[in-house]
Amino acid sequence: MRSSKSPFKRKSHSRETSHDENTSFFHKRTISGSSAHHSRNVSQGAVPSSAPPVSGGNYSHKRNVSRASNSSQTSNFLAEQYERDRKAIINCCFSRPDHKTGEPPNNYITHVRIIEDSKFPSSRPPPDSKLENKKKRLLILSAKPNNAKLIQIHKARENSDGSFQIGRTWQLTELVRVEKDLEISEGFILTMSKKYYWETNSAKERTVFIKSLITLYIQTFEGHVPELVNWDLSLFYLDERSYQRAVITNRPGSVSPIKSPTSNFTTNTTQSVGSVPFSAPTERTRRSETESVNPVSTPASVEYHAGMKSLNKAPYSSNSTLNEVNKRYELEQQQQQEEAELRRLEEQKRLQLQKENEMKRLEEERRIKQEERKRQMELEHQRQLEEEERKRQMELEAKKQMELKRQRQFEEEQRLKKERELLEIQRKQREQETAERLKKEEQEALAKKEEEEKSKRNKVDNESYTQEINGKVDNLLEDLNAVLAEETETTPTMQNGTYVPERSTARAHDQLKKPLNIAKVESLGGSDLNDSISLSDEIAGLNTSNLSGEDQDEKNDLSFEKGDEVRYSNNFEGEAPHVYHEVSIIQEEAPAVSQKLILPEENNESEALIESKEEIKTMENIDDEVLLEILTDINWSIEDDADSMIERIDLRLAETEYLFNQNLLSLQKIGPNIRPYEDKVNDECHRIIPTLSLFLMEMSNFSNDIENVESQDNGLQVESANKKLLWNTLDELLKTVSLDEISLNQLLECPIREKNLPWMENQLNLLLKAFQAIGSDGNEVEYNLREISGLKQRLQFYEKVTKIFLNRIVEEMQKKFSNIRGQDISHDQMIRILTTLLIFSPLILFCKEISQKSYQAIVENWNVSIQPVYMELWTKKISQLQGIDTNDEKMNELSLSQLLNEWDTFRKERKTNDINPVFKNSFSLLTECLQTMRQECIVYQNFVEVFFHISSKHNFEEYIKHFNDPDAPPILLDTVKVMQSDREAAVIETQLVSRIFQPIVTRLSSYFVELVKAEPTVAPALTFYLENEIKSLESSNHEFLLSAVTRMYTQIKQVWSDNVEEQVLHFERISNATTNGEILPGILDLPVGLKNSEDLFQFAKRSMDIKDTDEGYESIELMNSSFRKLSIAATRSITHKEVNSSINPNLSDTAALNNDYMETISLLVNSNWLTEMLSMLNFNKDGIFDTSLQNVKKVFDVEKESYASFLLRDTMPKLTAFVYGVSNIIENTNNVNMTNPSRWAAYSRQNLENILLAYTSHEIETLVKRLHTHMVNDFGYHQENAINNVLCDKLWSCIQGQTVSLYLKLYTVIDKHYRGTNIRFTKNDIISAFEEYKNA
């Protein structure tokens, strides 16, 4: 039993209409206040028995609270939604002219949101209809811009991005009927060529929209209205009389909403009175047709005509006519009584159904209340959890505030303590100065004497200290100066950058020799690399205090606080004037690194200048390939103007923004998962704070020791325990910064070859270490040896050597790159060349670490050199592909022949075999090209990553150690790597690959698009192949290749969809075409194309070794939907002919049969072709062609019967006319007053005997032969023999069946009304005659 609730809204609150509205069948005037659902405080006795019970509570509104606020909120929500939809609809559908015709857009009038059921589009869906069948749509009313009287009704949908798109459109003139659903308060039916059942979101929206629609109809058609069924006419300001005057009922397909028994009786009576066997005009028409076929006039025809004239003069002169009238009158009375009884039964069923619906509504409301209570409990629980979370956050925030407050108090106490200590120091200084001023005059003489004695004592100490230093074997300064000034040709041994010092007890101050001259190095201006450092000058300031007395007093008085270690480290490091002072206090702890300060103003100015330069450079260097790629992404065409291109770009930007917003929304779901980790981090920070405080306290204990060491005059007098560590450190540093000049000279002259690379890498590693040890302007190191005068010149020498070597590397690599360009290479040779170049990757890393300018020059030279190589390589490849001719006539003939052979095998064995597709070679070349592109992109990106060290984390020393390790795995360039976590490196790699392969991919995509346009059967297999490639590259590091394949897949899919739409439009255009019994080209090519596409798809599936394709492949769904759409469009074109055809299989109109004879033959040939081919294609395809097969079989069955009837009429005109005429008379009379047709002049016994004289057994054979000849002439030369034989067998069986049926009807008529009449042939004669030609 159907429920009264809408199947579209199962889980929403029921808003039922009034009882009076539900119980009304036609136009009843109701008062809104009389609704039984809204009655309050009414006793049960006052309610009629037919109304639902009221006592006990209102079923629709059981709560006693006022709903005025809810109604207001609902109205406001509907108004806001209506306004939003109106603006969006105007913006999307009525703001731009038609891009095809150029016509201005329509003027928007109004709209309403509706819900339709795809399974029940013309009737109310059952309550158990599935939710996936429900589609949200909109009905929009608009007017033509040039004629406000031309109103259109549009059905639109809302896209996922919020835009609207118009689908089907009707003219307002097509609106015939508007019916109101009495059971569903939101449902209504519009009849526009056929019925459409829709539901609005609320009853109020339905009322407002229908009222606007009818008002607009009245204004447009000058007061006329369509048929209004079950509506309150007062809603449209009409009454019954004005409605009868305004309604339009003379249109085809219209049905009056109010049935009149009187009019029915009059119509039936008229028909009964006028139901004479033949009227005069009809007889004249038929007689003229008979005479055209057989011009010889028989006496029977004359008598028949005379009889008709007498009948027209006195229609009631015969008793049989009066009896027939009386009999029909009694039948009409009996029919009226039966209709009254049926109406009473229907009323009882309706009342019972209403009671059952009321019970179901009560159960539904009870269930809704339970769900509402459960939802309220869940919301309350969630609110409590949120409240607890908020309290916990407030407690944590309070703890943080207390901690900050305690820290500020501690800092304030430290500041006050520091100020008190400073005041105390100043007071003591003032007292001391006063005392010293009083005793100054008395102590002047004593002070002078003490100063003289002190100076003498210091001089003696310095001399003894100098002798002590010169006498020590492990004197540090002596060895340091010896290393920097020693001759390279004598006693010191230097080999490969290593130094071995020689100790001596006496140092001779010989004149130092100058370094060797190097041809490749510019003159250093006559200055020696190893100038001697005067020992006496260096020692003169060793014992001088570095800090003044005031600084010492200030540092001794200050306490150690948080952040003081940075201040102290800066002071100590900045105030050390002596070059050896920093070396003398080397400790095991690493000192703080000095930081460079940059003013904010200068930084902002420099950044602004850089940004302006980059903008100018970007505007000047617009890449045409990038611009072409953007246009290709939006699927532009040559016919597009600037507005259409901007519209396409806006759509693509909207899609990108939507995806970006979706990703942002998905981040909100991750937020709560991060909260526990944040709490853990805060807890760990609270645990570290006490440890840090303890560390600061311990650090303050060492501050005094540090200040004591810094304040000593003899800072180089370190403990003997640190001397060995200091010596080892200095020894290592000096060995690092001292390189063999001969080796450097050889480095500049050594050719860059594979055999020389290990030695060159060793020398470059030593040179790089020297740079790092000495320190350069751009590097921040723990120590800086650039201040040593002996190392300044050596550093300049190293820098010049490095500069020359870098220029040499750039030149040599440019030559190697140019050699690649001059070669005629293949794809495999290109991969081997890239693998060979990897041996020079350490040199590229050296350039990257030393000079970014040289590194960028090498990268740019590589891009400039390699791009023409790949472009030339792929130009040849694409030229070879363009030689494929997929649209050759031989290929089409081969496809048709292969299809017929496969059909013949399927008809005999009922199975299909895997065969080689026609376009196998072409598709193999395409996939081979795509596979080559995939391999080369992967190899090139891996090469760029390794050769240019884009994502490498190793320094030069680590890299050459790993690179030269024989146990290390080899570098494989054709390996697909996982997605890289370093996004900056990934972007750089993508840019380098895109610069080379972007033009190639663009040309290749254009070729594929043109190929698919020329031969669309390749598209399904190609999209399937590309989608499989996308799935394999989704989690890989090759982002450019993934984007290129995705873009290519999107373009081919779009071209395939456009081709399908064009074919559908083609089938719609040929729906009225008629051929001379031949198959339409589109109908003939459709199974060929579908078979080729299916075979090529299966071949691609087998070649890629894919077993399971049930899930995740969009291309398969696209292919199935396209096949289904094409087959339905083809069958609809034939169905449209059949619907519009006037052929009547009962042979009542010979002229119509003659006029549509050729169309019947065309329909038979086309429908038979589609039936046979679609049956084969539907095998193992999950029934995607079931609907098309059913439609085309219906067409074939109807046309088959029509064709057989036509042949019988043409071959045996007299006999068929007589038999079917008598049969019609017998069928149209009742059993009470049986009419004897033999009494009629046209159907007399004598007339029948004269007709049967011409039909003997021999004549039957002649007639059957004539039938066969006629059929062979119609279908003998329009198709191959196999299809022709199948079609002829079907038609021959149908003709035999109708001939036998004609004989049986003749035998029945003779047995009832013409007994004694002799038939000179038998049924066996007919069957044997047909069997003779069945296998011919």
UniProtKB/Swiss-Prot annotation:
| Keywords, ordered alphabetically | Coiled coil, Exocytosis, Phosphoprotein, Protein transport, Transport
* CC terms in the record's Gene Ontology section: cellular bud neck; cellular bud tip; cytoplasm; exocyst; incipient cellular bud site; mating projection tip; plasma membrane; prospore membrane
**Protein name per its UniProtKB record:** Exocyst complex component SEC3
GO MF term list: phosphatidylinositol-4,5-bisphosphate binding; small GTPase binding
Q: Does the keyword Protein transport apply?
A: yes
- Work out whether the entry's keyword set contains Protein transport: yes
The further comment given in this record reads: Present with 377 molecules/cell in log phase SD medium.
Please provide an example of a Pfam family that matches this protein in its UniProt record: Sec3-PIP2_bind
Modified positions (Phosphoserine) in chain numbering: 606
- GO BP, one annotated term: vesicle docking involved in exocytosis
The source organism is Saccharomyces cerevisiae (strain ATCC 204508 / S288c)
Q: Where is the composition biased (Basic and acidic residues)?
A: 429-462
Region Disordered, as annotated, extends over 1-74, 252-300, 429-467
The record's family statement is:
Belongs to the SEC3 family.
Q: Name the Gene3D superfamilies on file.
A: 2.30.29.90
Compositional bias (Polar residues) at which positions? 31-47, 252-274, 291-300
Residue numbers carrying Phosphothreonine? 290
**CDD domains according to UniProt:** PH_Sec3
Q: What does this protein do?
A: Component of the exocyst complex involved in the docking of exocytic vesicles with fusion sites on the plasma membrane.
Subunit text: The exocyst complex is composed of SEC3, SEC5, SEC6, SEC8, SEC10, SEC15, EXO70 and EXO84.
